[in-house]
A protein has these predicted regions:
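Membrane-interface micro-motifs in multi-pass membrane enzymes
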Residues: 78, 82, 128-175, 197, ...
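Hydrophobic, aromatic-rich transmembrane alpha-helices
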Residues: 213-223, 300-337
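Hydrophobic/aromatic-rich transmembrane helices and adjacent perimembrane loops
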Residues: 159-166, 203, 301-315, 334-391
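Membrane-interface alpha helices of multi-pass inner-membrane proteins
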Residues: 182-210
Length: 538
């Protein structure tokens, strides 16, 4: 009897599991798609030259790998990226070494991770056809980087793009983990960790979680209910702020890096009307849809087609905003019980990021769109999460598939562009050939030359200070300006820099030799220029 009963049960189990190829089809397709996306984005990132910002991050990671984990002596920008992108740079440099291509590899890894995480957040707990449509819609919207400004804003440097990663991880945690106290603690730790690396987390992570959770909790209290999980999650998010501040102070106390003061402040009222069109263009540029900035028929076509992604995100934002208003309205606890916590946080995060950009920055060009770079992955996740089901029920999947295919083709076309050499690779090679190993330059030439040379040339960043020149407190290892231990006998500049050859002569006297190479002016002295620099300036 045991034989007759075991056979059918074993057969059902085999059928339920399905044949091996079917069970592995989706994981294989997912892996292949992620690899294809990585290499496409890597090629697209390569169309942009590696400049000083990315070079500085690469040099910081290199020092962290080689005995300076706290970046002693470094004066960073207003964003350290210490717990966000710099660990990724370290991992890549362990394999690839110190070279300009590290910046492109990190950009491709970050963007691929963002697409994957946005797809998972969009999918949520849905399975089957709806879960697939949700994920593909989010991933499709993110096939947006266009050549030029969009690629620069999203891929060139760790300029807030990667800050979307911890926020999406947080939303996955909230969506998938049990509603228990330890989930709230884990969320708070994740926010504190990310906040050390980028203060933007305060706007797109801490603030949305606190606002949504505590608003829900207060609404429930009015109906004599206590939402302990929302209270715990909101409090954990709020406590991430003092925790991150304590971590930053601890790093400084241990002799670690110093962060520059954030220059952002409320703009004057007269600036706001000018910010309106630039904010709109910045938003559209993230989706490759900045029609006003497109030049040429091909780029205009690219931008017009990519308007679809921006429109979908705007539609999801309106829908999500309406649901959030209903959740927080006087409709009783039943509405809040059915509300989507993740979608609510996404709505507040997107609105907060755009509002901060509009109110705190004098937006002069679309290049500043990197300040709202997380809006792209967060918006894509929101669109997939809220619109995937309705699109499926409206039988618009064929249209979605066609759009996804077209976006993929256009990404491939954008990735086929000419690969750009590092920004100052030519002059770095020239300096090596002429035996010049330690010098100074304006910011955009200094660390870039150091990276382009693989670290064989040391360059310090200087700026005007009165009638002389001084080291600049911005993405710089200030130890190299110690004239007792280091020397610098040449100066490099290009047309357009504030530090001109005339300024260098006024500061250091007549040079012993002057060279001109491809637009660069290289001035050499037979003395240590560090002794004639003024005190460091911010």
């Amino acid at each position: 009897m045991s034989v007759t009963t075991a056979g059918p049960r074993q057969g059902r189990t085999a059928r339920e599991r399905g044949p091996w190829p079917r069970r592995w089809a989706w994981p294989a397709a997912f892996t292949a798609g992620a690899l294809l996306l990585f290499f496409a984005v890597l090629r697209l990132a390569g169309t942009q030259p590696v400049k000083a910002d990315a070079a500085s991050n690469a040099l910081q990671a290199w020092q962290m790998l080689h005995g300076n984990p706290l970046l002693h002596g470094w004066w960073l920008t207003d964003v350290s990226f210490y717990t966000t992108e710099l660990p990724q740079f370290m991992l890549v440099e362990l394999v690839a070494g110190l070279r300009p291509e590290v910046a492109h590899i990190c950009a491709a890894l970050t963007y691929t991770l963002l697409v994957v995480l946005a797809a998972f957040v969009a999918r949520g707990r849905s399975r089957g056809a709806e879960g697939t449509v949700r994920a593909l819609l989010a991933a499709g919207i993110m096939l947006a980087p266009a050549p030029g400004e969009t690629a620069w804003a999203l891929l060139l440097t760790p300029n807030h793009t990667g800050t979307g990663v911890p926020v999406l991880l947080l939303l996955l945690l909230v969506d998938r983990a049990p509603r228990r106290w330890y989930t709230a603690v884990a969320a708070g730790v994740l926010l504190a960790w990310a906040l050390v690396g980028d203060p933007l987390i305060l706007v797109i992570g801490v603030l949305p979680v606190v606002v949504v959770c505590l608003a829900r909790a207060c609404l429930a209290l009015l109906h004599r209910r206590v939402l302990w999980y929302e209270i715990a999650l909101g409090c954990a998010a709020a406590l991430a702020v003092p925790a991150a501040d304590a971590a930053n102070r601890f790093i400084v106390a241990l002799g670690g890096y110093t962060v520059s003061k954030n220059p952002a402040k409320l703009v004057q009222q007269s600036v706001l009307p000018k910010n309106v069109p630039m904010t709109i263009r910045s938003f559209l540029s993230l989706f490759g849809a900045d029609v006003a900035g497109a030049r040429g028929t091909l780029n205009e076509t690219f931008a017009f087609i990519h308007l679809a992604g921006a429109v979908l995100v705007l539609a999801a934002l309106v829908l999500g905003g309406w649901r959030l208003v209903r959740t927080l309205g006087w409709r009783g606890p039943s509405v809040a019980d059915r509300a989507d916590l993740v979608a609510d946080v996404l709505v507040v995060a997107i609105v907060a990021n755009i509002a901060a950009y509009f109110l705190f920055y004098q937006i002069k060009n679309v290049d500043q769109a990197h300040e709202i770079a997380p809006v792209l992955p967060l918006g894509a996740a929101l669109a997939g999460r809220l619109l995937g089901g309705p699109l499926l029920r409206a039988r618009l999947v064929p249209a979605l598939a066609a759009g996804l295919a077209y976006y993929a083709v256009m990404l491939g076309f954008a990735a086929s562009g000419r690969q750009a050499p590092p920004d100052n690779a030519a002059v770095a090679g020239w300096l090596e050939q002429h035996g010049l190993r330690s010098g100074i330059a304006p910011y955009w030439e200094a660390n870039s030359v150091t990276l382009d040379s693989g670290g064989t040339i040391t360059m310090g960043s200087v700026k005007l200070a009165g009638r002389g020149l001084s080291p600049w407190h911005w993405n710089e290892d200030m130890r190299i300006f110690n004239a007792s231990h280091h020397t610098a006998n040449f100066f490099v500049t290009v047309p357009g820099e504030q530090v001109t050859p005339a300024r260098a002569r006024a500061a250091f006297g007549p040079p012993a030799r002057v060279y001109h190479f491809r637009g660069y002016t290289i001035m050499v002295w037979n003395e240590n220029l560090l002794r004639q620099l003024g005190p460091p300036v911010g």
